[in-house]
From Swiss-Prot:
Keywords: ATP-binding, Chaperone, Nucleotide-binding. One of its GO terms (biological process) is iron-sulfur cluster assembly. It comes from the Bacteria. Coiled coil: none annotated. The keyword NADP does not apply. One of its GO terms (molecular function) is unfolded protein binding. InterPro entries: ATPase_NBD, Heat_shock_70_CS, HSP70_C_sf, HSP70_peptide-bd_sf, Hsp_70_fam, ISC_FeS_clus_asmbl_HscA. NCBIfam families: HscA, PRK05183.1. This is Chaperone protein HscA homolog. It comes from Shewanella loihica (strain ATCC BAA-1088 / PV-4).
Length: 620
C-alpha cells in the first residue's frame, strides 16, 4: 500500500517565517478554531473567553448575529434563527421536510431543489449560512494571531458525500479563505492523540457530535495514520437525544400542539437537562408556555437512559460493522478515543466501554480534540513543518463503480480504499459499429445498479466504428484528498475522451446512509445470484446478436438442416434467457455453441479462401 505524504514538497521561500494557518471544526452544535502556537496546538478563545462558537445564525432587519447572540433568539424568533445548519448541507428540501416536517423555518426551494431559508434579511442557503458561521472564526484567528491566514483545514464527518464536502469548501470560498484540505473529523482526532500520546497500534475513534456519528478504525505506527475502516450515520447525534427527551416531555405534559417558539424552547430545555444529567442523578425539566402556563417534571438518569438506549445501540452496531470491515477483533483495539460533546453522556461511555472492553480515552477535551487535530494538520500543510513525517491514509466509505450491460455494477474503487486514489479499468463496445458509449457512475456495495446510488451520467462520443469488442475504452476514477470524484473515459486508438466531476445536487438521504451497508450484507447471497443471472443473460444476448449477424452475412454456407439446427438453438436460448434460471441459460449457451461449431469452422475456411484468392504460393 502506497503511503501518501501530506506535507507540501520543498522548503518555503522564507524558511524561518511562520505561516498562519488554522484548523476549524465546523460543527452541528458548536464550532471551534485552533492554531499551533509555539509548537502547541490549542483552540482560540473570543474576547469573552469562550472557545466554542454556537453554530447558530440569526437574520434580522438589523443584520446578522452569530453564536450566543443568535442563540438567545432561537426560541423567541425561530423563523429567522437557523440552528444545526450542518444537517441541511447538500440535502434537498424534499428530503429535509420528509425527515422532519415540524422544522420551525419558512422554506422555499432553489431551482435545483435545494433549501432556501426565508428570513427578514432575505433568502439564504446552507452554504451561505455556513459561511456566516466561519466568518467570526476566521476573524478571531486573524485577530489573535496578528495577520492574514494563508489557509485553513476544515473538518467534516467521514460520511459526508461529495455534495456536502463541496458545499463546505464553497462556504469558505465565499469568505475568500483558501481551504488547504477537508479533513475527516475522526482522522483529526487521531492526529491530536497520535502526536500527544504517542500511541501505536489499532485505535477506534468514536465520534458522536450534535448531528452526526462516525466510527473509524485506524492503525497508528511511527507517525503513519492508516484508516482501516469507517462507518457511522450522518443523521444521528446528540440532537436526537434532545428530540427523544423533548418528545417524552411533550407526551407527559399532554401538549398536543406547540408553537414554533414553544417547540424550540422545549428543545433548549431538553438539551439543558441532558447536559445536567452528565453530573447529576436527576434534574427538573421546566417549560413555560406562551400563555404563562408552567410545566415541570423531574427526569432521572434511568429515564433518560431508557429514552436514548436505542440510539446508543445504533452507534454500537456501527462499531461492530466497522471492526468487521477492518478484520479486527475487539481485543485488538488498544484504545478508544471519544470525540464530540455527546460522548459526555454517561450511558454512551458505559456502552462504549462495555463493547470495547476498556475505558475510553478522554484526556483531550472531546469538544476540542477535532479542532486541535485540524490545527496540527494545517500547520503541516502550510509549510511550517516541512520535515514532518506525518502520513495520513484516509479512505472512501462506499465503493464507486460503473454500470455495465445487464444493469450490473463493475466496482472500480472499492470501499475503504485509501485516498487520494486513481483506478483505471478497460471496457469495450457491445455492438458492431458502436460510435458512442454512455457511462453511469454509481456508489454502493450492491451488485445491481438498481440497488446502488446514482452519482452521474455522461457520454463518450466519436468512438471509431469497429467490430463489437474491438474498441478499448479506458475509464479512470480519481478521488482527491477531499473525497471529490472525477471520472474520465478515453478510447485508446483515437484518443477521444470525455470526463465529469461528480458533484451531486443532493446529499445521501438518511435512509440511504443508514441502510446501504446493512443491505449489502443482508442481500449478499441474493445479489450474487442475481448478478450471475444477469451476466448469463448478457452473454446470451451477445451470442444471439453475434450469430444473427453471422447468419445474415454467411448463412448461405449452411444447408437447410444445419441452419434449422442453429435457428432452433437460438430460439431456445432466447426463450430460456427471458426466464430466471441461470443454469438453464448457461446450458442453452453451451448447446448453441456446440450446434454452431461447424458454422464457425466454415466461416473461417471461407474467410481464408477469400483472403488467398488470386494469391500465388510465392506471395504467400
Amino acid at each position: 500500500m502506497a503511503l501518501l505524504q501530506i506535507a507540501e514538497p520543498g522548503q518555503s521561500a522564507a524558511p524561518h517565517q511562520h505561516r498562519l494557518a488554522v484548523g476549524i471544526d465546523l460543527g452541528t452544535t458548536n464550532s471551534l478554531v485552533a492554531a499551533v502556537r509555539s509548537g502547541v496546538a490549542d483552540t482560540l478563545a473570543d474576547e469573552s473567553g469562550r472557545h466554542a462558537l454556537a453554530s447558530v445564525v440569526r437574520y434580522s432587519e438589523d443584520g446578522v448575529q452569530v453564536g450566543v447572540d443568535a442563540e438567545r433568539f432561537s426560541a423567541q424568533d425561530p423563523l429567522n434563527t437557523v440552528v444545526s445548519v450542518k444537517r441541511f448541507m447538500g440535502r434537498s428540501l424534499s428530503d429535509i421536510q420528509a425527515k422532519d416536517a415540524s422544522l420551525p423555518y419558512n422554506f422555499s426551494a432553489s431551482e435545483n431543489g435545494l433549501p432556501l431559508f426565508n428570513t427578514q434579511a432575505g433568502q439564504f442557503n446552507p452554504i451561505q449560512i455556513s459561511a456566516d458561521i466561519l466568518r467570526p472564526l476566521v476573524d478571531r484567528a486573524e485577530k489573535t494571531l496578528g495577520g492574514s491566514l494563508e489557509g485553513v483545514v476544515i473538518t467534516v464527518p467521514a460520511y459526508f458525500d461529495d455534495a456536502q464536502r463541496q458545499g463546505t469548501k464553497e462556504a469558505a470560498s465565499l469568505l475568500g479563505v483558501k481551504v488547504l484540505r477537508l479533513l475527516n473529523e475522526p482522522t483529526a482526532a487521531a492526529i491530536a492523540y497520535g502526536l500527544d500520546s504517542g500511541q501505536e497500534g489499532v485505535i477506534a475513534i468514536y465520534d458522536l457530535g450534535g448531528g452526526t456519528f462516525d466510527i473509524s478504525i485506524l492503525r497508528l505506527n511511527k507517525g503513519v495514520f492508516e484508516v482501516l475502516a469507517t462507518g457511522g450515520d450522518s443523521a444521528l447525534g446528540g440532537d436526537d437525544f434532545d428530540h427523544a427527551l423533548a418528545a417524552h416531555l411533550q407526551e407527559s405534559w399532554q401538549l398536543t400542539s406547540l408553537t414554533a417558539s414553544e417547540r424550540r424552547a422545549l428543545l433548549i430545555e431538553s438539551r439543558r437537562v441532558k447536559e445536567a444529567l452528565t453530573e447529576q442523578a436527576s434534574v427538573t425539566a421546566s417549560l413555560t408556555l406562551e400563555q404563562g402556563i408552567v410545566h415541570e417534571q423531574v427526569v432521572d438518569k434511568a429515564q433518560f437512559d431508557a429514552l436514548i438506549e436505542s440510539l446508543v445501540k445504533k452507534t454500537i452496531a456501527s462499531c461492530r460493522r466497522a471492526l468487521r470491515d477492518a478484520a479486527i477483533s475487539n481485543d485488538e483495539v488498544l484504545e478508544t478515543v471519544m470525540v464530540g460533546g455527546s460522548t459526555r453522556v454517561p450511558l454512551v461511555r458505559e456502552r462504549v466501554e462495555g463493547f470495547f472492553g476498556k475505558a475510553p480515552l478522554t484526556s483531550i477535551d472531546p469538544d476540542r480534540v477535532v479542532a486541535i487535530g485540524a490545527a496540527i494538520q494545517a500547520d503541516i500543510l502550510v509549510g511550517n513543518k516541512p520535515e514532518s513525517d506525518l502520513l495520513l491514509l484516509d479512505v472512501i466509505p462506499l465503493s464507486l463503480g460503473i454500470e455495465t450491460m445487464g444493469g450490473l455494477v463493475e466496482k472500480v474503487v472499492s470501499r475503504n480504499t485509501t485516498i487520494p486514489v486513481a483506478r483505471a479499468q478497460e471496457f469495450t463496445t457491445f455492438k458492431d459499429g458502436q460510435t458512442a458509449m454512455a457511462f453511469h457512475v454509481v456508489q454502493g456495495e450492491r451488485e445491481l445498479v438498481a440497488d446502488c446510488r446514482s452519482l452521474a451520467r455522461f457520454t463518450l462520443k466519436g468512438i471509431p466504428p469497429m467490430a463489437a469488442g474491438a474498441a478499448h475504452i479506458r475509464v479512470t476514477f480519481q478521488v482527491d484528498a477531499d473525497g471529490l470524484l472525477s471520472v474520465t473515459a478515453m478510447e485508446k486508438s483515437s484518443g477521444v475522451q470525455a470526463s465529469i466531476q461528480v458533484k451531486p445536487s443532493f446529499g445521501l438521504t438518511d435512509e440511504e446512509i443508514g441502510t446501504m451497508l446493512k443491505d449489502s450484507m443482508a442481500h449478499a447471497k441474493e445479489d450474487i445470484e442475481r448478478r450471475m443471472l444477469a451476466e448469463q443473460q448478457v452473454e446470451a444476448a451477445r451470442v444471439l446478436e453475434s450469430l444473427s449477424a453471422a447468419l445474415a452475412k454467411d448463412g448461405d454456407l449452411l444447408d437447410e438442416a444445419e441452419a434449422a439446427t442453429i435457428q432452433a438453438g437460438m430460439a431456445n436460448l432466447a426463450q430460456v434467457a427471458s426466464q430466471s434460471d441461470t443454469d438453464a441459460i448457461e446450458k442453452a449457451i453451451a448447446a448453441l455453441d456446440d450446434a454452431s461449431q461447424d458454422f464457425a469452422a466454415k466461416r473461417m475456411d471461407n474467410s481464408i479462401r477469400l483472403a488467398l484468392k488470386g494469391q500465388s504460393v510465392d506471395n504467400i
